[in-house]
Amino acid sequence: MKIKSIEPTPSPNTMKVILTEELPAGKSNNYKPEQAEGAPLVIAEILKIDGVKGVYHVADFLAVERNARYDWKDILPQVRTAFGMESAESAEENRSDQESFGEVKVFVQMFSGIPMQVKLTDGEREERFGLPERFQQAILKLRSEASNVVFERAWKEQGVRFGDFDEIGHDVTEELQAAYSDERLKRLTEAAAQGKGEAKQAVQRKAYKVTLDMLDDEDWKKRYAHLEQMDPKEEDIPVLQKALDDPKVSIRRQAVVYLGMIETPDVLPLLYKALEDKAVSVRRTAGDCLSDIGDPQAIPAMIKSLSDSSKLVRWRAAMFLYEVGDESAIEALRAAEDDPEFEVSLQVKMALERIEHGEEAKGSVWKQMTESRKKGE
């Protein structure tokens, strides 16, 4: 068994290693470092590499997952060595204390519709962040008036963010404080304490029509609370356009998330605007949305993002061009080939190789999945 090629995936922390041999149909194996003894020799060697978190083997490829604090430029030569293809150069651990490719998963522990605490994890590290006293008081009231708190508490996933744990924790707790006013907490507490079927419906998130004037409130927490309870539709684009100019980063980022959910061509100019936002988190989110939408009209905007100051934005732009780019991107990709960040440079080279060899763009992973489902219907 040898390596045919190594390709990036939608996650900067996973690489796809294409093999010359294929597993029997329907068979797959998932290996972790602690299971190395029972793994095939080649995979056992890969699991010994510093920074490798796991290997998933299915069909004709391996999905190698890394710890975000380790560089692929140190890991991949050792993966090739495990297959006997070439000797790995001795590489020192190269961890960045600045921006990381690490994906941080965000969870909020809920009790009858009321947030209790925030949990962040990158797969290796976990941190929890508490909420202010008023949230705890609401929980204490329900402990005495409702059923068993252990039974009713549950972790709700809030998606993925990038960056420093403390920064993300601060942002998420601040957003929850804004979204759950004293009035909303009181309403949720009273409804949950009833313990009836209709009460359970009452504590669920209620969407309402957000108007332009609601975003004029001087208190950013009230502006965010309105936006948080929006059910975004195409008719809400003018409101989201206004939110993109809000001085609060959390509001601009939430507006971008909603624009990505709408997905119609009308949102593209606004996502292009968000790609130039002064806040990196907003630009990253805009890039993710454009990648998920996968519209070739975004090629010029993503070409421009190849020179963004954030390596994550540059990586996302290169990934987009790999997925849907055409000949118009070749010049910019050639200029970006020697990006100082290994992951960005690799993704740029992959995009350039696909386009120059005349291979048809496959579209984003989400688009491929959608088309696959349609064919199966």
From Swiss-Prot:
InterPro entries: ARM-like, ARM-type_fold, Nfu/NifU_N, Nfu/NifU_N_sf, PBS_lyase_HEAT, Virulence_F_dom. This is Uncharacterized protein YpgR. One of its GO terms (molecular function) is oxidoreductase activity. It comes from the Bacteria.
